[in-house]
Amino acid sequence: MSEPIQNENVESNVADAADIAAATAATEEFTNTIGDAIATASEEETIEAAPVVLDGPIQTVGRRKRAIVRVRLVAGSGEFKCNGRTLEEYFPNKLHQQLIKAPLVLLDRENQFDIVATLKGGGPTGQAGAFRLAIARALNAYNPAERGELKKAGFLTRDARAVERKKAGLHKARRAPQYSKR
């Protein structure tokens, strides 16, 4: 009585092996076809974009939390104007100043551009983060070939974190009223 069951198992194992072999062959064929398409696409990408000639100001926008910063990047000597004031006056905290200048320092362009910024909303940290994003976007527009460096450092990534809204029945966004068992 046990022999018919063994024969059925052997037949199903043979069928499974045939299915696996067919699937593997189909996968290899698909990979080879896609690989050819990817190879031609990557060959096109190796052509680097030439830097844009700065004939006018580059204008970009950066956002972080509730802050919005509009930046105008023009050829100059490395001067910053934030709502009509210098960077040191507007951001007295050295950490915020370093955060803002980071994209320029990374690409070694600290004294190549003058930056005029309009900052609205949020607090100093949010404004500094938005300012950094706007500067990075402007540098990317100036020379798209340097996009990889900016992206790798995380300067072109918009930080999507924002304050979570308060929910009904809770004290804050997640703080629930104290629980009493009895």
UniProtKB/Swiss-Prot annotation:
<dbReference type="InterPro" id="IPR020574">
    <property type="entry name" value="Ribosomal_uS9_CS"/>
</dbReference>
<comment type="similarity">
    <text>Belongs to the universal ribosomal protein uS9 family.</text>
</comment>
<dbReference type="GO" id="GO:0015935">
    <property type="term" value="C:small ribosomal subunit"/>
</dbReference>
<dbReference type="GO" id="GO:0003723">
    <property type="term" value="F:RNA binding"/>
</dbReference>
<protein>
    <recommendedName>
        <fullName>Small ribosomal subunit protein uS9</fullName>
    </recommendedName>
</protein>
<dbReference type="GO" id="GO:0005737">
    <property type="term" value="C:cytoplasm"/>
</dbReference>
<keyword id="KW-0687">Ribonucleoprotein</keyword>
<dbReference type="InterPro" id="IPR014721">
    <property type="entry name" value="Ribsml_uS5_D2-typ_fold_subgr"/>
</dbReference>
<dbReference type="InterPro" id="IPR023035">
    <property type="entry name" value="Ribosomal_uS9_bac/plastid"/>
</dbReference>
<keyword id="KW-0689">Ribosomal protein</keyword>
<dbReference type="Pfam" id="PF00380">
    <property type="entry name" value="Ribosomal_S9"/>
</dbReference>
<dbReference type="GO" id="GO:0006412">
    <property type="term" value="P:translation"/>
</dbReference>
<dbReference type="InterPro" id="IPR020568">
    <property type="entry name" value="Ribosomal_Su5_D2-typ_SF"/>
</dbReference>
<dbReference type="GO" id="GO:0003735">
    <property type="term" value="F:structural constituent of ribosome"/>
</dbReference>
<dbReference type="InterPro" id="IPR000754">
    <property type="entry name" value="Ribosomal_uS9"/>
</dbReference>
